[in-house]
């Protein structure tokens, strides 16, 4: 079975992996039934949905949950070609990263190339290179402190990357420990 089919089955069958993926994406993306512009100015709704979103859009929680399951399945496409034997925790981190940077971004990333070789330590380091965002043409380093404090522009993205790095680096014992670390803010 391919990783994509494993993920789709996990989401549909409410397995531990499926529940973990859903919990992580919901936690990291947040929820809004009304369209809003994210920190990069992209119109967003539900749990980070951007496709076809316009100002003034509103969707129900039920519709958002359906879109989330569909979107996770679409993002699983980026894991095509990875070894089917990847640990579930690595799959969890990879799906969350793909959900954030997009299918194209993950498919063409050094992270994916390293995971194809099962080099988890190098893949973990490569995740942390994804720490920049551009807003109105200005590039921000999300890992940077300003006046001794975490920056206010995108520190949350940096915290997400640190958690993803540990998951992709296979440094959690289980799906539960990875999800619990994230929920308790211990992913960083």
Model-derived regions, located:
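Active-site nucleophile-His-acid catalytic modules used for acyl/amide transfer and hydrolysis
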Residues: 73-112
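Extracytoplasmic
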Residues: 40-42, 89
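Long, amphipathic alpha-helical surface segments
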Residues: 1-11, 19-40, 49, 53, ...
């Amino acid at each position: 079975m391919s990783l994509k089919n494993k993920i789709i089955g996990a989401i549909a069958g409410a397995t531990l992996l499926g529940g973990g993926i859903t919990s992580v994406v919901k936690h990291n993306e947040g929820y809004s039934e009304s369209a809003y512009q994210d920190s990069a100015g992209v119109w967003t709704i539900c749990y980070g949905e951007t496709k076809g979103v316009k100002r003034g859009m509103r969707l129900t929680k039920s519709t958002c949950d359906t879109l989330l399951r569909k979107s996770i399945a679409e993002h699983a496409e980026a894991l095509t070609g990875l070894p089917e034997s990847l640990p579930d925790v690595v799959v969890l981190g990879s799906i969350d990263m793909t959900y954030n940077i997009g299918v194209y971004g993950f498919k063409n990333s050094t992270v994916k190339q390293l995971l194809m070789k099962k080099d988890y330590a190098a893949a973990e380091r490569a995740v942390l290179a994804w720490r920049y965002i551009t807003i109105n043409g200005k590039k921000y380093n999300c890992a940077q402190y300003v006046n001794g404090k975490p920056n206010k522009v995108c520190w949350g993205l940096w915290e997400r990357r640190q958690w993803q790095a540990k998951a992709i680096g296979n440094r959690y014992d289980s799906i539960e420990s990875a999800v619990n670390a994230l929920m308790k803010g211990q992913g960083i």
